[in-house]
Amino acid sequence: MSDLDEIRRKRMAELEARQAAAQGQMQQQAQQQMQQQEAQRQFEEQKKALIAQILTTEARSRLANLKLTKPELVNQIEIQLIQSAQAGSLRGKVTDEQLKVLLRQIAGQKREIKITRK
């Protein structure tokens, strides 16, 4: 019986070690995920602050309304505006009219699918 007890004890110790390693790995993954979320939040805050500096109130309002329906398009426009501002190609704040022109340009770049029925 002592051999059987010894095998059981070794097996139990092995299982406990595996479980402890798995828990440590899960904690590390959770911590990494939290760090990524924090970095994403900081990026969004910085982007929001830059957009507030670049756009007029009316243009920001238009962009916020558009974000509800087309978030990918708004993200693309925000990135383009930030890059233009960092490159120094923007003079002053972007007005609502200038934003409309930019929206038309980007919307015109999309492929248009036309279906005709016969």
Curated annotation (Swiss-Prot):
Residues 16-39 are annotated as: Disordered. Belongs to the PDCD5 family. One of its GO terms (cellular component) is cytosol. This is DNA-binding protein Msm_0708. The keyword DNA-binding applies. One of its GO terms (molecular function) is DNA binding. Keywords: DNA-binding. InterPro entries: DNA_bind_arc, PDCD5-like, PDCD5-like_sf. It comes from Methanobrevibacter smithii (strain ATCC 35061 / DSM 861 / OCM 144 / PS). The keyword Nuclease does not apply. Residues 18-39 have a biased composition (Low complexity).
